[in-house]
């Protein structure tokens, strides 16, 4: 209660200051302010100069930012103002700015946004600063910022009030600046190699391209049920049919699933497709792309994630899913076996399975149970069973498996890719098998998409396709333990609801 009273008192004081400013004819929510410098650009220009060098000639600067600290009494004071690039100290003297501006400076609060004009100089202790000649209040802050040392520590509050998190935690701003640079680097790399960025619908009449529960909505004017897309895949393949031979899309995808450190119901993916390529080509593209991005934005392909040092320099390990399981458990799924025999093996090794699971499902369960989390260095796991890969080509040498790979780094899937299935008869059969699985209770199995099958009947060239989760890639490159750390506004449960996984 006392803390709430204290906050109310602070709010009242700031409201009173606002009223006083307005009574004096000042505008506490000002207009445009022309900056010539930022904290970073000022440091780049003048940090290397000595105190004496800066005094020899005048270096005028104009900056704006949020007041983060303030001190001083009498006729002079210091403050630190913060912009996107960092903080810079300002020095305000009454005899330099005049009585009115100095009174304004003394009245400002931490969190107010100000603009200053002045000259660069260094203090006695060598800190680069601005000797202010003109001081303006640009925005009056009516709420106090969290205390510097005891403030915004609660993780959930940081996610709910990301705007405060960005103000008081510079490393959080750095993460999201880096996220933007990662996307820029990715686009440049693909654009330079002839890929065309496209945009496809986010509302689908039939959800497809992944095994996931969709969000359902309704179009009133058309009186039809629509689904938020669970993948970008099927529309991009239609473009390959149409002759757009190298395409990609970076976009939002929606899956009506649990929230965890690895999952958010709304997330960002890149999907790309290249005609006349296969999954081996896409494997090479994937390692070169990710290594390029790391080198471009971090300056290195050796990164730290948690307790692990990860080497992203190609060429990465490649291992068949069956071989990876055999290495870890000794179980040999190369042997021909029935679905019943596969399920019996699972029970023998305490791998949870359902009675409806086939040989292919069991292989995947073994992999997830015994292998996945142990793949720390970049590893391409290929040869997924047909049963869990309804959109991938069968392997010509062993039709139980597909020409598909997933990329694992630090025990997490980061990419999924195929030699795309372009046989419309086989595709229809795969969809029909998925319908059987839906009838058996798998609500994540694919629906039949007649229009997509029809598009394949016109002929889709051999194609390699790739999907990369942008959020997980950003987590990896920023050493962030939770997906919420790399989403500006992650989905949060209601404050009074129990946590969900």
UniProtKB/Swiss-Prot annotation:
Xref: InterPro entries: Aa-tRNA-synt_II (IPR004364), aa-tRNA-synth_II (IPR006195), aa-tRNA-synth_II/BPL/LPL (IPR045864), Lys-tRNA-ligase_II (IPR002313), Lys-tRNA-ligase_II_bac/euk (IPR034762), Lys-tRNA-ligase_II_N (IPR044136), Lys-tRNA-synth_II_C (IPR018149), NA-bd_OB-fold (IPR012340)
Example of a GO cellular component annotation carried by this entry: cytosol
Cofactor comment text: Binds 3 Mg(2+) ions per subunit.
Cofactor annotation: Mg(2+)
Cell membrane in keyword set: no
Organism domain of life: Bacteria
Annotated positions binding Mg(2+) 1: 406, 413
EC number: 6.1.1.6
Compartment(s) where it occurs, according to its Swiss-Prot or TrEMBL record: Cytoplasm
UniProt record similarity statement: Belongs to the class-II aminoacyl-tRNA synthetase family.
Subunit relationships: Homodimer.
Protein name, entry field: Lysine--tRNA ligase
Source organism of the structure: Halalkalibacterium halodurans (strain ATCC BAA-125 / DSM 18197 / FERM 7344 / JCM 9153 / C-125)
Gene: lysS
């Amino acid at each position: 209660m006392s803390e709430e009273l204290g906050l109310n008192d602070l709010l009242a004081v700031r409201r009173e200051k606002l009223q006083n400013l307005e009574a004096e004819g000042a505008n506490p929510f000002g207009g445009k302010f022309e900056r010539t410098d930022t904290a970073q650009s000022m440091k780049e220009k003048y940090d290397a100069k000595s105190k004496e060098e800066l005094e020899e000639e005048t270096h005028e600067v104009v900056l704006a930012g949020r007041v983060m600290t303030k001190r001083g009494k009498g006729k002079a004071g210091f403050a630190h103002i913060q912009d996107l690039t960092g903080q810079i100290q300002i020095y305000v003297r009454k005899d330099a700015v005049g009585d009115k501006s100095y009174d304004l400076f003394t009245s400002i609060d931490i969190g107010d946004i100000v603009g200053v004009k002045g000259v660069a100089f260094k203090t006695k202790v060598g800190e680069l600063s601005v000797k202010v000649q003109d001081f303006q209040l640009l925005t009056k802050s009516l709420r106090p910022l969290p205390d510097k040392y005891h403030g915004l520590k609660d993780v959930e509050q940081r996610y709910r009030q990301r705007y405060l998190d960005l103000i008081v935690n510079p490393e959080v701003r750095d993460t999201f600046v880096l996220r933007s640079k990662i996307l820029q680097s990715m686009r440049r790399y693909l654009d330079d190699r002839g890929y065309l960025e496209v945009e496809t619908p986010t509302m689908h009449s039939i959800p497809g391209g992944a095994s996931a529960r969709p969000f359902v909505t309704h179009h009133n004017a058309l009186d039809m049920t629509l689904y938020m897309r669970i993948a970008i895949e099927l529309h991009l393949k239609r473009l390959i049919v149409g002759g757009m031979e190298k395409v990609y899309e970076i976009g939002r995808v929606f899956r009506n699933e649990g929230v965890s450190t690895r999952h958010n119901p709304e997330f960002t993916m890149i999907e790309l497709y290249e005609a006349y390529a296969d999954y081996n080509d896409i494997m090479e593209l994937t390692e070169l792309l990710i290594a390029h991005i790391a080198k471009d934005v971090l300056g290195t392909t050796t990164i730290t994630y948690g307790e692990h040092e990860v080497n992203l320099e190609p060429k990465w390990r490649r291992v068949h899913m069956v071989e990876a399981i055999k290495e870890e458990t000794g179980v040999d799924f190369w042997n021909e076996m029935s679905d019943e025999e596969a399920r019996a093996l699972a029970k023998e090794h305490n791998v949870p399975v359902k009675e409806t699971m086939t040989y292919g499902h069991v292989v995947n369960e073994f992999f997830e149970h015994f292998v996945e989390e142990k793949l720390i260095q970049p590893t391409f796991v290929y040869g997924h069973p047909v049963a869990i890969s309804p959109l991938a080509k069968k392997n010509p040498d062993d039709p139980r498996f597909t020409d598909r790979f997933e990329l694992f780094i630090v025990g997490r899937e980061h990419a999924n890719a195929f030699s795309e299935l372009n046989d419309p008869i086989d595709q229809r059969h795969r969809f029909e098998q998925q319908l059987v699985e839906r009838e058996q209770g798998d609500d994540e199995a694919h629906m039949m998409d007649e229009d997509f099958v029809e598009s394949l009947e016109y002929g889709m060239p051999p194609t390699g396709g790739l999907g990369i989760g942008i959020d997980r890639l950003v987590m990896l490159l920023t050493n962030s333990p939770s997906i919420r750390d790399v989403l500006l506004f992650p989905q949060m449960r209601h404050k009074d609801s129990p946590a969900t996984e």
